[in-house]
């Protein structure tokens, strides 16, 4: 698919160091989780307010760390986190979900607004700090 082509092309760039990751938001977050079901050479998958596949056979194929970023006020997506966490744990697959207080769906974009509530900005800042820390540690 498109991400596989992009991944292969990016690996050939002069500045590439062999590390790659995938990140998506909302629908793209769900696609990031889906991509992780077949990816083998990624340093990680970073899912922002996206849902996981519900097929345990697909989840069982995940071989890369999946890092979830969720807003506490996003009931639709958050209703899926525990089932995902339980399935990934039972399958012994790497999944870490963090839920940020004061944030809803789309909090990374909404938290960038200078007029955003302080709690929303704090959630965005904490998620961004976590993302950059995880990327720096990626191998």
Regions from the language model: what does each represent?
Residues 1-23, 137-138:
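Gly/Ser-rich "nucleophile elbow"/oxyanion-hole loop immediately N-terminal to the catalytic nucleophile
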Residues 24-28, 32:
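Gly/Ala-rich beta-loop-alpha elbow adjacent to hydrolase catalytic centers
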Residues 41-51:
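A conserved short beta-strand
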Residues 89, 94-139:
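C-terminal catalytic histidine-bearing segment of alpha/beta-hydrolase fold enzymes
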Residues 9, 34-38:
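Active-site signature of alpha/beta-hydrolase-fold catalytic machinery across serine-
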Residues 62, 68-70:
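Short beta-strand/loop motif that positions the catalytic acidic residue
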Residues 72-78:
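Acidic catalytic loop of the alpha/beta-hydrolase fold
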Residues 78-88, 100:
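Short alpha-helix in the alpha/beta-hydrolase fold that links the catalytic acid
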């Amino acid at each position: 698919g498109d991400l596989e082509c992009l991944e292969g092309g990016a690996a050939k760039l002069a500045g590439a160091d062999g590390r790659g990751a995938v990140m998506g938001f909302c629908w793209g977050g769900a696609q990031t989780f889906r991509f992780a079901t077949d990816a083998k050479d990624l340093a990680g998958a970073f899912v922002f307010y996206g849902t996981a596949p519900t097929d345990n056979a697909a989840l069982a194929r995940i071989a890369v760390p999946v890092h979830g970023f969720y807003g506490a006020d996003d009931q639709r997506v958050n209703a899926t986190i525990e089932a995902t966490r339980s399935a990934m744990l039972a399958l012994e697959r790497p999944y870490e979900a963090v839920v940020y207080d004061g944030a809803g769906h789309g909090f990374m974009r909404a938290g960038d607004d200078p007029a955003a509530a302080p709690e929303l900005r704090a959630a965005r800042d904490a998620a961004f700090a976590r993302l950059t820390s995880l990327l720096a540690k990626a191998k």
